[in-house]
C-alpha cells in the first residue's frame, strides 16, 4: 500500500493531499475565487502569486490532518501538465524540493489523469477498461481508459470547453464568475424548453458529423444574439435562458457519451471535472445510461473540482507500476493525455 503526498497548482486552486490505498487521509484546498472574481476569470500572474503565498501552509495542513510524518510518506507528486506554466512551477518546485530533501521518489502527474483517478477514489472497485467523460473549464474530452497510463481520446471539443462556455454565457447574462454554479442554480428555477438553442456539430469532409466531437462556440454566439434580441424587446428571463443553455449542453454531452460507450462496448462511464457537478448533466446522463443498461459514475462534488487527492491517487497507481519522474521534469502548458507515459523514466 502506497502513501503519497500530492500537490495540485495547475490553475487557481492551491491544493495538497495525502492518499493511501485509494483512501483520502487529507484533502486541503486554498481557493482563489475571491482573488479572480473582480477580473471575471483567472489571471495567470495573480494565480502564481497566490500559489506562492499559500503553498507551504497547504502542505503543512495536509500532513497535519493526515496525522503523518515524512517517514510515513512513500512518494511526493505534483501536477506538471497541462495548465498555467507559472502556476505549475510553484507546485512542481515545492514537490521536487521536498522529494530531494526527504529522499522520496517524485512523480509528475497529468492533470486529466488526475480527474480520471478521482473516480477510483469515489469507487474503489472501478478498474479499466471504461469510458471517461472529462468536462471542465479547460477540457471536454471522451477518453477510452484502457489501463493506467494507456488512454485513447475518442472525442473532444473543437473550440470552447464546456466549463468555459458556462463562464462566458454567465458573463453575457451578468451573473459573475465562476459561471457554472450560478447557471446551475438559476436553471433549476427556469424552463429548459423556453428557448431552442443549437447543439454544435462537427462536419466531416465526406459528409455527416463527427459522432463524438463537440463545439460550444456556436451555442455561445446563439445565446449572445438571443440576449441582444430579448433586451430590445424589454424582457430578459434569466432563469429560462440559463435552463435552456444548460439543457442544450447536457443533451449534447449525453448524446455523444452514450453513443461512444455503446460503439466501443464499454459498460461503465466515469465522469470527471468541474462540470461533473452540474445537476442538469447528471440528470441527463443518469437517465440515458439507465435506458441503455450502462453504469455511470459521478465523483462526489468535492472531487469534481481541482484537488490534490486525485493527483495522489494517480501517482500511487504509477508508483505501484515502478514509474517515477526525473527531478528535471518541467511544467507544460499543453500535453495530450495519450502522451502521459513520457513523464516517467
UniProtKB/Swiss-Prot annotation:
The subcellular localization recorded is: Cytoplasm
Q: What are the protein's UniProt keywords?
A: Acyltransferase, Cytoplasm, Iron, Metal-binding, Transferase, tRNA processing
What does the record give as cofactor?
A: Fe(2+)
The residues that the entry says bind Fe cation are: 111, 115, 306
Q: How is the cofactor bound?
A: Binds 1 Fe(2+) ion per subunit.
Where would one find the signal peptide in this protein? Answer: none
Q: Where does substrate bind?
A: 134-138, 167, 180, 184, 278
| Alphabetical GO biological process terms | tRNA threonylcarbamoyladenosine modification
Query: Any idea of its EC number?
Result: 2.3.1.234
Organism superkingdom:
Bacteria
| Gene3D superfamilies from the UniProt entry | 3.30.420.40
Q: What does this protein do?
A: Required for the formation of a threonylcarbamoyl group on adenosine at position 37 (t(6)A37) in tRNAs that read codons beginning with adenine. Is involved in the transfer of the threonylcarbamoyl moiety of threonylcarbamoyl-AMP (TC-AMP) to the N6 group of A37, together with TsaE and TsaB. TsaD likely plays a direct catalytic role in this reaction.
Which family does the similarity line name?
A: Belongs to the KAE1 / TsaD family.
Annotated protein name in UniProt: tRNA N6-adenosine threonylcarbamoyltransferase
Question: What is the species of this protein?
Answer: Cyanothece sp. (strain PCC 7425 / ATCC 29141)
